[in-house]
Amino acid sequence: MAASAAATAAASAATAASAASGSPGSGEGSAGGEKRPAASSAAAASAAASSPAGGGGEAQELLEHCGVCRERLRPERDPRLLPCLHSACSACLGPATPAAANNSGDGGSAGDGAMVDCPVCKQQCYSKDIVENYFMRDSGSKASSDSQDANQCCTSCEDNAPATSYCVECSEPLCETCVEAHQRVKYTKDHTVRSTGPAKTRDGERTVYCNVHKHEPLVLFCESCDTLTCRDCQLNAHKDHQYQFLEDAVRNQRKLLASLVKRLGDKHATLQKNTKEVRSSIRQVSDVQKRVQVDVKMAILQIMKELNKRGRVLVNDAQKVTEGQQERLERQHWTMTKIQKHQEHILRFASWALESDNNTALLLSKKLIYFQLHRALKMIVDPVEPHGEMKFQWDLNAWTKSAEAFGKIVAERPGTNSTGPGPMAPPRAPGPLSKQGSGSSQPMEVQEGYGFGSDDPYSSAEPHVSGMKRSRSGEGEVSGLLRKVPRVSLERLDLDLTSDSQPPVFKVFPGSTTEDYNLIVIERGAAAAAAGQAGTVPPGAPGAPPLPGMAIVKEEETEAAIGAPPAAPEGPETKPVLMPLTEGPGAEGPRLASPSGSTSSGLEVVAPEVTSAPVSGPGILDDSATICRVCQKPGDLVMCNQCEFCFHLDCHLPALQDVPGEEWSCSLCHVLPDLKEEDGSLSLDGADSTGVVAKLSPANQRKCERVLLALFCHEPCRPLHQLATDSTFSMEQPGGTLDLTLIRARLQEKLSPPYSSPQEFAQDVGRMFKQFNKLTEDKADVQSIIGLQRFFETRMNDAFGDTKFSAVLVEPPPLNLPSAGLSSQELSGPGDGP
């Protein structure tokens, strides 16, 4: 199409220039003489249009058909060529807009100053610039040309003899006599004389004669006037003008037009390339918009997940506090009701005795009546203790400001340096956010920056985030990249978030590339930190105590990273009842956090370099994804396809030797095989028919591992992971303290003897509950032990069917609550004496 358009443009431009610059003396002859180069250029344009590079049938239709009526241009339709190189019938051009009073005799058009709109491209042009389309005029004039050439006479002599030959060099028709003379003259004897057609010079092109000298052909090209002339006109009207022979002029003009066509073709190819690049950029911009939408939805999903998790923690904490108060009040109410009934009976009997007329009976029963009356008066009834008010505290203004500052979209121009997100101004002015390392610029890089205040009303300062510290980073690099991306949907969250709910405190840092996930740091509280440019929060900074007489549900003072490797906590954290304190580098082991204790922690986070991104193999997540469900540490993790729990290879039960596939399911989600099909004749106690104690069968081994993995993943069981490493437990029972880690080692046959039956496994777990129960006097802890025991028994029953393990579990002692000052002897009767 480019070659066709270029050839057509060049040929039409040459035709228009020649017609416009014709002299008055050779007006019609000049117009007719232009048919020779014009026809040649039209043939070249037609060939280019029909080639594979051409525009096809539509481009050819625009060249040979009217742009208005779509009819083929014929001489009888008076075809016209506009300056924009579009063709149209003279009748289809329509009336011109008058712009001047001058009229032109060219085809009866409007005045020279009138404006005409092109029917194809709507470009305006002057009517004087519209010329006749000589290419299409010659298409139907072959017959008339042949009849005219048949009567052509010789022009070399005065005899008017019919011409039988034609000299190509002289462009003259010759008779037989002149041909012989032509071949005798030394100057003309080498000329080419054709006898095939007296008036034919080329196939498809007829000879054009001068309109002044009717018998003289147009064989010269006047360079000064830029028009075709005959020999007589060149000697008279164009005397002393520079001229060329027709063949030389055509050759030179073709070279000039070919050079222009080549230049325009190169420019057109560059334009096509740029057009493709712009179209590709449009698609890239659309892809960037979709990717930004996905990033925003992913950030919102992560925030809602953290809100859901935090909401469950707060609800559980409130439930624990209220359950203890409710149980104590119920026991007090039961005691008071019993005393009340006893006093009512004494009052009723004493009143009945006083109203009785039997004086003898009154005197005989005086001792018993006095005894019960004095005994009832001695009973001490404790007053009702006022219970403190419990309320949920949160800063609405801070959360509103945090929501208003939720992220930002930064579009970087190509060539600019990426310096990372600047410090965001949070509601409570935390320390500045700094991102270490330098990153390469992207054509369109989306960066999200967040700054928020703390949700702890008693906190005096904000934690300072200086980056991310990786753990388990030396476990090797795995090629490839496969990440488990959660579905962006609100139906998966079981927390009802109303319109008044606010997002948690969080900060977002961009990934190293546009394909990496952004680092979202969730803050569920704040610890005391040095203001300004302080490095990290010092561990162990005390928080402000709660108000007296008010039960406050404590919030966790921790930070969680989503989409990037979370840092290992550097100090203990405040957790609910039976939640462990995260061990730091110098800690001896996990400890139980007292409900009344108040601690705070600092977290140092070191950001990874932007220029490098960790990669992982199929089925494995690097430490930037999440933390292990068992050990709560980052690293190379595998994610379950169903529950989306993440585990280290050695933390999962059974331990994984290789990285599983993408559709891997953990032991908690895997369907257990039927006990009867797997075990055969082997009983639950692990002994065979000969009475020799054997190891656990493969089916029982898998079921025990599933139950133990459920205990490891159960949040309230976290203090029981490593009881034996704590000095407190070692002093109570030296050498005999059990914890989940030792039970796992024995189940994996790392300690001897291994378990031989599920009952033995259940006995060890029950003994662990009993040991922990002896070490605590807190009623809430005892209540939690009862809940853990029920959880374990439920898991065992689910794994082993109808088999009951209640007998092997140690039942913790009942709660010894006060009986309002009454002993069992006093409530039983007066048999003890006064």
Curated annotation (Swiss-Prot):
The entry's family comment says: Belongs to the TRIM/RBCC family.
Self-association and partners: Oligomer; the RBCC domain homotrimerizes and interacts with one molecule of KRAB to form the KRAB-KAP1 corepressor complex. Interacts with SETX. Binding to a KRAB domain is an absolute requirement for silencing gene expression. Interacts with a number of KRAB-ZFP proteins including ZNF10, ZFP53, ZFP68, ZNF382 and ZNF256. Interacts with NCOR1, NR3C1 and CHD3. Interacts with CEBPB (via the RING-type and PHD-type zinc fingers). Interacts with CBX5 (via the PxVxL motif); the interaction occurs in interphase nuclei and competes for binding POGZ.
Give the UniProt keywords, A-Z.
Answer: Acetylation, ADP-ribosylation, Bromodomain, Chromatin regulator, Citrullination, Coiled coil, Isopeptide bond, Metal-binding, Nucleus, Phosphoprotein, Repeat, Repressor, Transcription, Transcription regulation, Transferase, Ubl conjugation, Ubl conjugation pathway, Zinc, Zinc-finger
What is the main EC category here? transferase
Q: What happens when the gene is disrupted?
A: Embryonic lethal with arrest at stage E5.5. Gastrulation fails and expression of the critical mesoderm differentiation factor T/brachyury is lost.
What InterPro entries does the record point to? Bbox_C, Bromodomain, Bromodomain-like_sf, KAP1, TIF1b_Bbox1_Znf, TIF1b_Bbox2_Znf, TIF1beta_RING-HC, Zinc_finger_PHD-type_CS
Zn finger residue spans: B box-type: 149-196, 205-246
Residues making up the signal peptide according to the UniProt record: none
The species this protein belongs to is Mus musculus (Mouse)
* Annotated crosslink Glycyl lysine isopeptide (Lys-Gly) (interchain with G-Cter in SUMO) location: 554, 676, 750
Cross-link Glycyl lysine isopeptide (Lys-Gly) (interchain with G-Cter in SUMO1) per UniProt, renumbered positions: 378, 469, 750, 779
Described function: Nuclear corepressor for KRAB domain-containing zinc finger proteins (KRAB-ZFPs). Mediates gene silencing by recruiting CHD3, a subunit of the nucleosome remodeling and deacetylation (NuRD) complex, and SETDB1 (which specifically methylates histone H3 at 'Lys-9' (H3K9me)) to the promoter regions of KRAB target genes. Enhances transcriptional repression by coordinating the increase in H3K9me, the decrease in histone H3 'Lys-9 and 'Lys-14' acetylation (H3K9ac and H3K14ac, respectively) and the disposition of HP1 proteins to silence gene expression.
List the disulfide bonds in this chain: none
Stretches of Low complexity bias are at: 13-23, 38-52
Q: Which GO terms describe its biological process?
A: convergent extension involved in axis elongation; DNA methylation-dependent constitutive heterochromatin formation; DNA repair; embryo implantation; embryonic placenta morphogenesis; epigenetic programming of gene expression; epithelial to mesenchymal transition; genomic imprinting
Instruction: State what protein this is by name.
Output: Transcription intermediary factor 1-beta
Q: Where is the Bromo domain?
A: 695-799
Q: Where does Zn(2+) 1 bind?
A: 154, 157, 178, 182
Zinc fingers classed as PHD-type: ranges: 625-672
PTM section of the record: ATM-induced phosphorylation on Ser-824 represses sumoylation leading to the de-repression of expression of a subset of genes involved in cell cycle control and apoptosis in response to genotoxic stress. Dephosphorylation by the phosphatases, PPP1CA and PP1CB forms, allows sumoylation and expression of TRIM28 target genes.
- GO cellular component: a single term: heterochromatin
User: Positions modified as Phosphoserine?
Assistant: 23, 26, 30, 51, 139, 418, 438, 440, 454, 471, 473, 479, 489, 501, 594, 683, 689, 697, 752, 757, 784, 824
EC number(s) per entry: 2.3.2.27
